[in-house]
């Protein structure tokens, strides 16, 4: 074989690629979730970062009289509605971080994607993931911490059955909004319902499909804890008007990017590194105890054999 035969007859791929522009995606962050809880909560703006929940004391003692019959002249009862003298106050909590970006990087490498914008986008997504985690698990204001012992029940046999969810509904029977649990919990309930011959219906919300029970959607969140093969089901009633659960945020922040979220440029240091402060102010309030209930110790590792 001659050297002429070894020579390329046309431009090769490797050399040609040096003149081609690759289409590049923005950075993909696998920890981003839909964060359905944030979408489903009603969000209330607060003043000075404080939200005070005033409750009635001894509501069963409010005296009301219904007329027994025509011509009754019995005296009417005297009553008043008393309030708590030390109501609970929720203080907004911050989730913050500093984002450092070298000015040389942002100057030279911001096409086609702006480096500063992408760094801030990914940071904000991570902060919002932490927000959902705190709204569920915070020992101060999380859903699980605010469920009272009277509103917490156990499963009948470990796995989440339709009977268990029915029992949970009796705790939040005044217009319940949604169940919240880990995806493994939803799968476990689907198995139990299907095994009993009552596969749960499906509803479309926000362009996604959710299974339901008694018309109430089961919302997944990987922030609901799973320990030793067990998780929890949370049933929530939302909204101020319904005396339910509400999310809290601070409006009118400097550098506001979203409700309760601000991004502020803090300066450039002597190493030419620019710094941005990203802060989210958030909390969650339960207006009445019966707005929230928890099904505890839900087994997610039980399976059935179908014959």
Swiss-Prot record:
It holds the Pfam family SrpI-like. Keywords: Cell membrane, Encapsulin nanocompartment, Membrane. InterPro entries: Encap_f2a (IPR049822), SrpI-like (IPR045641). GO terms for cellular component: encapsulin nanocompartment; plasma membrane. Its main location: other. It comes from the Bacteria. Shell component of a type 2A encapsulin nanocompartment. Forms encapsulin nanocompartments about 24 nm in diameter from 60 monomers, probably involved in sulfur metabolism. Probably encapsulates cysteine desulfurase. The encapsulin nanocompartment is formed by 60 subunits; monomers form pentamers which assemble to form shells. There are 12 charged pores where the pentamers meet as well as 3-fold axis channels and dimer channels. Isolated from bacteria in a complex with cysteine desulfurase (AC Q9KII6). Detected in antisera from mice immunized with killed bacteria but not live bacteria. Cattle naturally infected with M.paratuberculosis all have antisera that recognize this protein. This is Type 2A encapsulin shell protein. It comes from Mycolicibacterium paratuberculosis (strain ATCC BAA-968 / K-10).
């Amino acid at each position: 074989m001659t050297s002429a035969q070894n020579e390329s007859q046309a431009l090769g791929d490797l050399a040609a690629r040096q003149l081609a522009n690759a289409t590049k995606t923005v950075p993909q962050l696998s920890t981003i979730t839909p964060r359905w809880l944030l979408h489903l909560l009603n969000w209330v703006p607060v003043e000075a970062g404080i939200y005070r929940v005033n409750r009635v004391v001894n509501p069963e003692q409010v005296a009301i009289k219904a007329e027994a019959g025509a011509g009754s002249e019995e005296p009417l009862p005297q009553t008043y509605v008393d309030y708590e003298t030390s109501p609970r106050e929720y203080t907004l909590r911050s989730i913050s971080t500093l984002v450092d970006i070298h000015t040389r990087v942002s100057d030279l490498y911001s096409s086609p994607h702006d480096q500063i914008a992408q760094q801030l986008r990914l940071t904000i997504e991570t902060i919002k993931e932490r927000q959902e985690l705190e709204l569920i698990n915070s020992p101060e204001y999380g859903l699980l911490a605010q469920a009272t012992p009277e509103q917490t029940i156990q499963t009948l046999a470990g796995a989440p059955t339709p009977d268990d969810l029915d029992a949970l509904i009796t705790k939040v029977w005044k217009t319940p909004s949604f169940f919240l649990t880990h995806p493994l919990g939803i799968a476990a309930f689907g198995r139990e319902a299907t095994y009993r011959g009552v596969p749960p219906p499906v509803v479309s919300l926000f362009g996604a499909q959710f299974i339901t029970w008694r018309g109430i959607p089961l919302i997944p969140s990987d922030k609901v804890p799973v320990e030793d093969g067990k998780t929890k089901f949370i049933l929530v009633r939302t909204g101020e008007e319904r005396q339910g659960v509400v999310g809290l945020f601070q409006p009118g922040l400097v550098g506001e990017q979203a409700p309760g979220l601000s991004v502020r440029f803090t300066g450039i240091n002597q190493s030419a590194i620019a710094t941005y402060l990203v802060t989210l102010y958030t909390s969650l309030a339960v207006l009445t105890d019966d707005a929230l209930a928890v099904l505890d110790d839900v087994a997610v590792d039980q399976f059935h054999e179908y014959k």
